[in-house]
Regions:
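Non-transmembrane, aqueous-exposed alpha-helical and coiled segments at domain scale
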Residues: 2-397
């Protein structure tokens, strides 16, 4: 007999698995002579649901049960999952962390299920694992990021040689569509928040408007065209290693400057774009993301500015009048007020500066979640603690 999921359960289902018809056919609950896939989610009780093996119908069924973002999915069969396990540093039932608000157990199996559903390739698994691991760091405050009415999204950045191995887009259009790794890994992170953390829109995710960045917000740094050290090196990782940084950021905002030919002028355009009322940073200073285009970076570097100089300048000049900062509706800490102006960052370290994108004099900035979320960088390491030189290093024999 088929059992139905209570609609109120929504995204509280923890395990999602589609088995091949042959494996479920001999179960007593399977209708006579019916070939059907088995969706077997487990929360407080075991629930068996039989769905048509047709992929389109499976996608619709998953959507109706709030397992997806509204886009079609790849059915997560055991065969597909085992291909993902081969690229994991862990075993299928190992728990990486607990993801709030539901404190769902992020097992390797569950992460792989969401990776398959999102359309990831198996070799994307090491990056997906590290992104999910970073989200559980207390300073990231995933509970607050998921539950807030603010439209903060999970932005993930990859550094190191793995960006080439996964054929990630670090150049033209890196924040947009058209790249398999960028699109599907970012999507898989969001599906993990749906199905493991329980952060479904209107249930565990209470963003007033939401954000298109909550579909996928994932890219790599264009290290080859950057005049400065990449982010993971800045944070203490070897240049030849690879790393994933997770951040809580708003949707990116364009900075158009085709006329400035000095470092100061380019940076002034950037800080004036950042210095807006109504962002969280204006009343609770914290991190912000500056994705500088190679052409703007070349101009700034050509003026003799080191990366730390740029971060210092943005910290000192990204400010708003105190009366605008107070409009955020929270008590403004006066220690961030100087000469009747509020600093949007607490220190130069709050300025996350990377280089990405292609030709054109456009830079992108994104405000953060204020003091409520701090970015976390995780290196791609193997079980023995050594850095992975390639995703192939993860392959289990």
């Amino acid at each position: 007999m088929k059992q139905k999921i209570d609609k109120s359960c929504g995204c509280q289902i923890e395990d999602i698995l589609v088995e091949s018809p042959e494996k479920s056919k001999d179960k007593t609950s399977v209708e006579s002579e019916q070939k059907s896939d088995r969706l077997c989610p487990t929360s407080r009780q075991d629930i068996e649901i039989f769905v048509d093996p047709d992929v389109e119908k499976i996608s619709l069924d998953f959507y109706q049960k709030k397992y997806t973002d509204g886009l079609p999915i790849i059915p997560p069969t055991r065969e597909r999952l085992h291909k993902f396990y081969k690229y994991s540093a862990y075993e299928a039932q190992d728990v990486l962390n607990l993801l709030p608000p539901r404190q769902g157990k992020a097992t390797i199996e569950k992460i792989a299920i969401n990776g398959v559903m999102a359309g990831c390739l198996p070799l994307f698994m090491p990056v997906l694992e590290k992104a999910i691991l970073g989200l559980s760091d207390p300073k990231f405050n995933l509970d607050g990021v998921n539950a807030t009415t603010h439209p903060v999204a999970i932005c993930a950045l990859v550094n190191g040689p793995i960006t080439h191995e996964l054929e990630m887009n670090t150049g033209a259009g890196c924040l947009g569509p058209g790249n398999l790794a960028n699109a599907t890994i970012g999507r898989a992170i969001r599906l993990c928040l749906f199905n493991i953390a329980g952060a479904f829109p209107g249930i565990g995710d209470h963003a007033t408007m939401g954000s298109p960045a909550k579909y996928s917000y994932f890219f790599g740094e264009n290290e080859e065209e950057s005049p400065w050290e990449p982010l993971h090196v800045e944070r203490g990782f070897p240049k030849e290693s690879s790393a994933v940084t997770v951040m809580g950021m708003e949707t990116p905002h364009n900075v158009n400057d085709h006329r400035s030919n000095t470092a100061e002028d380019v940076l002034d355009t950037i800080v004036h774009t950042i210095s807006t009322a109504g962002c969280n940073n204006s009343h609770v200073p914290g991190e912000l993301l500056v994705i500088m285009s190679p052409e703007h970076a070349e101009t700034v570097d050509g003026g003799g500015w080191a990366k730390k100089d740029v971060k210092n300048y943005i910290h000192e000049n990204a400010i708003v009048p105190v009366e605008l900062g107070d409009r955020g509706g929270r008590r403004l800490d006066k220690k961030w007020v100087k000469n009747n102006m509020v600093s949007l960052t607490r220190s130069p370290d709050d300025v996350i500066l990377v280089v990405a994108g292609g030709p054109g004099r456009h830079t992108t900035v994104a405000h953060g979640f204020g003091t409520s979320c701090e970015s976390v960088t995780k290196g791609l390491v193997l079980k023995d603690g050594s850095f992975a030189g390639s995703v192939k290093d993860y392959l289990k024999k």
